[in-house]
Amino acid sequence: MPADLKSLLHPADTRILLVVMDGLGGYADAGRGSELEESATPNLDRMASAGSCGLLEPVGPGITPGSGPAHLGLFGYDPFEFVLGRGALSAAGLEVELKPGDVAARANLATLDDQGRVTDRRAGRPSNDEATEAVRLLREGVHIDGIEVTFAHEAQHRVLVVLRGEGLSPQLTDTDPQATGVAPLVARARTPEADRAAEVVAELDRQSRQALADQPRANCLLLRGFDSHQELPSMADRYGLNPAAVAVYPMYRGLARLVGMDVLGPAADLSAQVTLLSDTWTHHDYFFLHHKGPDSAGEDGDFGAKVTAIEQLDAVMPDLLALEPDVVVVTGDHATPSQMAAHSWHAVPALMWGPRVGRDPVSTFGENACLGGALGRRPAADLMTIMLGASGRLAKYGA
């Protein structure tokens, strides 16, 4: 953010809508377009033809981002300046208070074979009932001397783990190998101050495997994103906005909460999200709507399911446009190509629509089409100031 941006902030009776399709980006291969390019998206195509398009680099060229830094960039926070671990995000999403000295981690319920190798990093995406039972077993079976261990279920395979005790540091490497066919990693201390925490995590791993030994799928925990309590400057302070978030998954609700958004809901699905946003439209001037479906399908390697998830978002766009936002941006936080079944470094398509945005030659919303758009190829963190300008919220700079 430019150092003098705050001096340019200009009050305006305008509203901004940021729609994030998680994992939207992909790429074409073997005579087939990306998932977005193969989707039937008449509403998004009309918006693209009437607005401006481009490609966003979530963190930097060639860098594969996690969801946390990718979203921070979209909110106008430099991901290299504001570094958040997944544990802190999950804790904020579940409204679990982290005290000074606590260490939080995001954990996946996962499946190990008889040789101790990971066969499924997400334990087959268990139902909430199945995952809740696994968390109950963990609470009953894990007891570490001098350490208070908290387990909280987030959604499906996602679990929050919080460690509280003397001498703990979050400066640890992950135990999640981010791959199958290999054993979980051993948490290593990045600094001498984290030696005690590494010992605690090793004991946590041992006891959690024992507690889950009889579970057919969710029989271990993979931990990543160790972090402690975090505070970020609010969007109200940085950008003069009164922002709100409509998200289903706790982690994204937590990230929104950390940057000072009013977190609405909960809402169970996309339809409920749109209704909730509509009902609160006059209460805020910036809305973040998060749609998880494309990312989940991409991570499962399911091209068709990702297409369906994109088309579901397209179908609700008329309801959102009926609210008459002054600026709408539709984009993704990162790419999750189904060919890779994982996050990737690819740039993410973005479209901006509104009366002050202007029109470029792009007529369809897709990766290759967006290459020729007026927004160009730029860091995702640039997006916030462009939205502020397009909504009449920045005064002229200089004489």
Where is each model-derived feature located?
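Feature captures the catalytic ectodomains and active-site-proximal regions of enzymes
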Residues: 1-399
